[in-house]
Amino acid sequence: MLKNYKLKAFALLLLAGSVLGSCDYLDIAPAEIMTEDKIFQDITLAQQDLGSMYHDIIKWTALNSDDRLLRDGPFTWTGCAGDESIDHWGTTAPTTYFKLGGLTTGYNPLGDWSWNYALVRKATNFINKIEGVPLTQSQQQTYGTKVKQFKQEARFLRAYMYFDLLRQYGAVPLITEVQDIADISGAQVPRDPVNKIVDFICSELDEAASVLPDTWSDDTNYGRISKAACLALKARTLLYAASPLYNGNTMYKDVKNLDGTQLFPQTYD
């Protein structure tokens, strides 16, 4: 009896040891998981990363609550918010809340704060790293000039995100470096004045326009950012900046940072 007990105990110890020893495989990162280091070691992956930013300009959420798609695209959010049409989502639709005055600081489907800043971070990281991607000799011939264009396309996309923030919120934090996600205090950035945001957007678009072609010649580049797109967005940004909403609007005279910085210009320019 004692002998059988010892044999069972020994077998259990062996089994436990084999199970614990086999857990090492869990420490290996799955090959299909893409990391930032992998992306910026391969020009093809880096180009795909840029493509994903083009995709992210549109907030691909539920169509009934997607602000950019409904505000600027083929769907008309304002049509459903008025009496022109009825949202098929019924009483749960954001447009219904809009009609009834139900939008609050806690529920605002038109707000893109997190989405925009996520893309700002992604574009900034791309701008900082794309020129460091190693290229083979054959890739140098293909991508030598394109890398500079990739960088400026990302610069445009970042400027567009700030334009979108400007037209929604006016003065916003201007973040031009990739923040450390572990540094909570460093993430607490105050808002910058409207004029500073406008100047930044225009400066970024000028730089991008100086590198990108006037237009793209072949259909494979259809939809890519061009010099014309940069100048068009700059013109629209300046139009917003010159509007009574932002230019000398005294309704915003008390909108200041804690240090007293005036966030909206109070004199008409």
Predicted regions located by residue number:
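Amphipathic alpha-helical protein-interaction segments enriched in hydrophobic
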Residues: G223-L233
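Short coil/turn linking the two alpha-helices of tandem helical-hairpin repeats
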Residues: L166-R167, P173, W216, Y240-N249
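Membrane-proximal, proline-rich intrinsically disordered regions
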Residues: C23-T76, K256
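Bacterial Sec-dependent N-terminal signal peptides
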Residues: M1-A31
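Conserved, well-structured interaction surfaces
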Residues: D42, Q47-L63, D87-Y169, S185-D199, ...
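A solvent-exposed, charged loop/short amphipathic helix patch at secondary-structure junctions
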Residues: N249-Y268
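Outer-membrane beta-barrel and related beta-rich outer-membrane complex signature
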Residues: A31, S65-L69, A171-I175, N247-T250
